[in-house]
Curated annotation (Swiss-Prot):
GO function terms (MF aspect): acetyl-CoA carboxylase activity; ATP binding; carboxyl- or carbamoyltransferase activity; zinc ion binding
Keyword Zinc-finger found: yes
Top-level taxon of the source organism: Bacteria
Annotated ranges, domain CoA carboxyltransferase N-terminal: 25-284
Protein name, per record: Acetyl-coenzyme A carboxylase carboxyl transferase subunit beta
Cofactor note: Binds 1 zinc ion per subunit.
One cellular-component annotation, GO: acetate CoA-transferase complex
Gene: accD
Gene Ontology process terms (BP): fatty acid biosynthetic process; malonyl-CoA biosynthetic process
Pfam families reported in the protein's UniProt record: Carboxyl_trans (PF01039), Zn_ribbon_ACC (PF17848)
Subcellular location field: Cytoplasm
UniProt organism field: Pelobacter propionicus (strain DSM 2379 / NBRC 103807 / OttBd1)
PROSITE patterns in the cross-refs: COA_CT_NTER
């Protein structure tokens, strides 16, 4: 008898096809490490149902969550940044613009619309952090200024939702000028007796914090949002001191009088409607 003769049939090794999980179907929460269905997270406005961690959210999805359905219209959507300084670091500014545009989202770091909240007409500007870190250049400053000026002209409240790394370094002094430009426009809104509501989300830093983001008649933040000028690591290295726990987080700023209220994203629309009902009376 041959040593290699098989007297019994071998194990059936029929290959079972492995099922492929679609990319992006699951999301791991950085707050509690829970694995969440992406569609469930989106349905809850990117707020973790387990721990309440506020994931970042796109500008248009945020607008859908805040404004009355089918009432808002985007304005100044064709404006795009130009590399007028021929700025180049590891790659040119124009390459960075083209890369951001290729993602197919916003044409710059802010989306400005006219819409309504519970029937109250408002001018709203929402930052898109996915576009060059929500940095403020000349286009962002101009779009925000125009939104504020429309508010003055039409006697409507202005709401700005910030999510930004600050002024756009590729535009040098012209980006810093937007801080004064937007703040001056808000002074006109104040003189007209119209409310400005500032919503600070994670992160709101740099020149955006140092200008319009902290000038609201009501300053609202999302839970645990990072809000500050320089980053905590830069401050620690400069001062050579350990910063307090929770420094630059929304809760710390509220405790020290820098904010009026912290509102979860899922409750933001109702809170805005309530505030507008108190601060604003439409012209008859």
């Amino acid at each position: 008898m041959s040593w290699f003769h098989r007297e019994r049939a071998g194990i059936n090794r029929t290959q079972i096809k492995k099922s492929r999980v679609p990319q992006g179907m699951w999301v791991k929460c950085p707050g509690c490490s829970a694995t969440l269905l992406a569609k469930d997270l989106d349905a809850n406005l990117n707020v973790c149902p387990t721990c309440g961690h506020h994931h970042r959210i796109g500008a248009r999805r945020r607008l859908e969550s805040l404004l009355d359905a089918a009432t808002w219209q985007e304005l100044d959507s064709g404006m795009t940044s130009v590399d007028f300084l021929q700025f180049k670091d590891s790659k040119s500014y124009q390459e960075r613009i083209d890369s951001a545009l290729s993602k197919g989202g916003s044409r710059d770091a802010v989306v400005c619309v006219e819409g309504s909240i519970e029937g109250t007409a408002v001018q709203v500007a929402v930052f898109d952090f996915s576009f060059m870190g929500g940095s403020m250049g000349s286009v962002v400053g101009e779009k925000i200024t125009r939104a504020i000026e429309r508010g003055v002209q039409k006697r409507q409240p202005v709401i700005i939702v910030s999510a930004s790394g600050g002024a756009r370094m590729q535009e040098s002094i012209l980006s810093l000028m937007q801080m004064a430009k937007t703040s001056a426009a808000l002074a006109k809104l104040k003189d007209a007796g119209l409310p400005f509501i500032s919503i600070l989300t994670d992160p709101t830093t740099g020149g955006v914090t140092a200008s319009f983001a902290m000038l609201g008649d009501i300053n609202i933040a999302e839970p645990k949002a990072l809000i500050g000028f320089a980053g905590p690591r830069v401050i620690e290295q400069t001062l050579r001191q350990k910063l307090p726990d929770g420094f630059q987080r929304a809760e710390y700023l509220l405790e020290h009088g820098m904010l009026d209220v912290i509102v979860p994203r899922t409750e933001m629309r109702a809170k805005l409607a309530s505030i507008l009902g108190i601060l604003y009376r439409p012209a008859a």
